[in-house]
């Protein structure tokens, strides 16, 4: 929005031309999202306490979690607000990719909001019926994917980039829709499953979003895309603004979500952030890189799949409890140790993912 204002004001003062640079707007977006989160955080927490929107805890979970019962949840609304406002302020709203990102973010956020609200009103951990939850997640994902397919079905925007192989980039055709569906829905659920400890999901989210900001910038720059042997995608550079908004909002939320948490993001935050990371990976054609950089999310999701599958087939559990972060808690690891070690692993995976861009 401010891009258009700057284009007008530059006639009178050339300094406003700086706002046209994506790097300047990326930094300003991050700071805006961060400050909004820090500013509204105490107000949101107080309002959630007044409304008695408290966290419900699983009866079969670690005993240390019983103390968390009643902690304000649905704090993800301030993440969404921070991302939305900062993106609308600093992004070029003529770019269709921005609207696709916001559509998935708020679409999944709405699904998570309903899920959280049902848990709170029913005073248990059961939210939306699973089939309806996946139905609406699928609807949002497919609308976004078909929108993107229509925008770039005959360009590099639908090629599959494979790490380490610079000359292998097959055109996906209609399979683009199938792959993109599983990326968005899968990432949404994976981040949701990871969000079980104070700050566990939000820091990896910020790290992955920050890495995708760099990748989006390179993908939208003809020279860097050619240098790195990745597809040049016309609209992708503006996705940098959206990614840095996620980073800023996530860091702001972490201020209140760090152990011991004053607020939890709830499904309204975790589903939205997961869906957002998924759609960004699709936009910059780095689905495989998302698997590497978001390895913590992948392992958390796989631990649940393996646990459920093993119990149904063999009546035996692989882990003491799933997702896997609870397994380590039940082994005696203090919660802060689990969180920090998962953060370290996430940082290493993000750096490994970025390195693969050059090792091609």
Swiss-Prot record:
Cofactor(s) of this protein: Mg(2+)
GO CC aspect terms: plasma membrane
Reaction it catalyzes: UDP-N-acetyl-alpha-D-muramoyl-L-alanyl-gamma-D-glutamyl-meso-2,6-diaminopimeloyl-D-alanyl-D-alanine + di-trans,octa-cis-undecaprenyl phosphate = di-trans,octa-cis-undecaprenyl diphospho-N-acetyl-alpha-D-muramoyl-L-alanyl-D-glutamyl-meso-2,6-diaminopimeloyl-D-alanyl-D-alanine + UMP
EC number of this enzyme: 2.7.8.13
Pathway(s): Cell wall biogenesis; peptidoglycan biosynthesis
Subcellular locations according to the entry: Cell inner membrane
Transmembrane segments: 21-41, 73-93, 94-114, 132-152, 168-188, 199-219, 239-259, 263-283, 288-308, 338-358
Domain of life: Bacteria
GO function terms (MF aspect): metal ion binding; phospho-N-acetylmuramoyl-pentapeptide-transferase activity; UDP-N-acetylmuramoyl-L-alanyl-D-glutamyl-meso-2,6-diaminopimelyl-D-alanyl-D-alanine:undecaprenyl-phosphate transferase activity
Annotated GO biological process: cell division; cell wall organization; peptidoglycan biosynthetic process; regulation of cell shape
Alphabetized Pfam families for the sequence: Glycos_transf_4, MraY_sig1
InterPro entries given in the database record: Glycosyl_transferase_4 (IPR000715), PNAcMuramoyl-5peptid_Trfase (IPR003524), PNAcMuramoyl-5peptid_Trfase_CS (IPR018480)
Enzyme type, top EC level: transferase
Topology with respect to the bilayer: Multi-pass membrane protein
UniProt keyword list: Cell cycle, Cell division, Cell inner membrane, Cell membrane, Cell shape, Cell wall biogenesis/degradation, Magnesium, Membrane, Metal-binding, Peptidoglycan synthesis, Transferase, Transmembrane, Transmembrane helix
Function recorded in the entry: Catalyzes the initial step of the lipid cycle reactions in the biosynthesis of the cell wall peptidoglycan: transfers peptidoglycan precursor phospho-MurNAc-pentapeptide from UDP-MurNAc-pentapeptide onto the lipid carrier undecaprenyl phosphate, yielding undecaprenyl-pyrophosphoryl-MurNAc-pentapeptide, known as lipid I.
Family that this chain belongs to: Belongs to the glycosyltransferase 4 family. MraY subfamily.
PANTHER family given in the database record: PHOSPHO-N-ACETYLMURAMOYL-PENTAPEPTIDE-TRANSFERASE (PTHR22926), PHOSPHO-N-ACETYLMURAMOYL-PENTAPEPTIDE-TRANSFERASE HOMOLOG (PTHR22926:SF5)
Annotated protein name in UniProt: Phospho-N-acetylmuramoyl-pentapeptide-transferase
Organism name: Haemophilus influenzae (strain PittEE)
